[in-house]
UniProtKB/Swiss-Prot annotation:
It comes from Caenorhabditis elegans. The keyword DNA-binding applies. Residues 104-163 bind DNA. It comes from the Eukaryota. One of its GO terms (cellular component) is chromatin. This is Homeobox protein ceh-28. It holds the Pfam family Homeodomain. Disruption phenotype: Reduced pharynx pumping rate and abnormal isthmus peristalses in L1 stage larvae. Feeding defects, characterized by a stuffed pharynx, as a result of ingested E.coli packing the lumen of the corpus and anterior isthmus in L4 stage larvae. Defects in pharyngeal g1 gland cell morphology. Reduced expression of TGF-beta, dbl-1, in the cholinergic motor neuron M4, but normal expression of other markers of differentiation, such as serotonin receptor ser-7b and the vesicular acetylcholine transporter unc-17. Keywords: DNA-binding, Homeobox, Neurogenesis, Nucleus.
Length: 201
């Protein structure tokens, strides 16, 4: 009996044990596409949740990106304003030239009352002075020849501007016929006699 029982039993070897199927390795060409596919599913879930929620406003993707950019811009206005000012200062050549001129500009010379009086007296006599006369006048007043030259240039410009303003004021005065009727024979009648009357007498 024992021999028959042993022969009827089957021995299972370890190699024949059924093992679960091993997961095949993911090919390298599909590894790079997995994150993008996951992102697609996440975006689909988010869009699906927006559609199912009636109280949540649906915002398009382009508008959402613009709103995110606007929120990041207004989150730090001081930094954006500072960067804009720096860009404007560096990109504007007029500002750079103005700064360089202000840095190169020499301090204004203050003349004393004695120097101004002497220069005014000389200007009444002659409006243009030669280089030698400028040197002599500068030595007498304790100035440089360049300072004397600039003073005369400014004084001539001031005199010319005053003459133009006076002419403009006279041109704006309205004509008064009563003033003209006070001189029926003209203003020249009070002056020298005409040549015709003198020849007749």
């Amino acid at each position: 009996m024992q021999s028959t029982q042993i022969s009827s039993t089957t021995v299972i070897l370890p190699s024949e044990v059924i093992q679960p199927p091993q997961q095949s390795a993911v090919p390298s060409e599909f590894k790079n596409t997995l994150p993008s596919r996951l992102n697609l599913f996440e975006g689909f879930d988010q869009s699906f949740s927006e559609l199912t929620n009636p109280y949540q406003p649906v915002i398009p993707l382009m508008q959402r990106e613009s709103l995110l950019g606007a929120s990041s811009y207004y989150s730090s206005p001081s930094q954006n304003q500072r960067s804009y000012q720096n860009h404007r200062q560096h990109s504007n050549p007029d500002t750079i030239n103005l700064r360089s001129q202000q840095q190169k500009r020499k301090p204004r010379v203050l003349f004393t009352q004695h120097q101004v009086n002497e220069l005014e007296e000389r200007f009444k006599k002659q409006r243009y002075v030669t280089a030698t006369e400028r040197e002599e006048l500068a030595q007498c007043l304790g100035l440089t020849a360049t300072q004397v030259k600039i003073w005369f240039q400014n004084r001539r410009y001031k005199c010319k501007r005053l003459a133009q303003d006076r002419t403009l004021q006279l041109s704006q005065i309205p004509f008064n016929p009563m003033f003209a009727s006070a001189f029926p024979f003209g203003i020249n009648s009070f002056g020298t006699a005409p040549s015709s009357s003198s020849s007749g007498s």
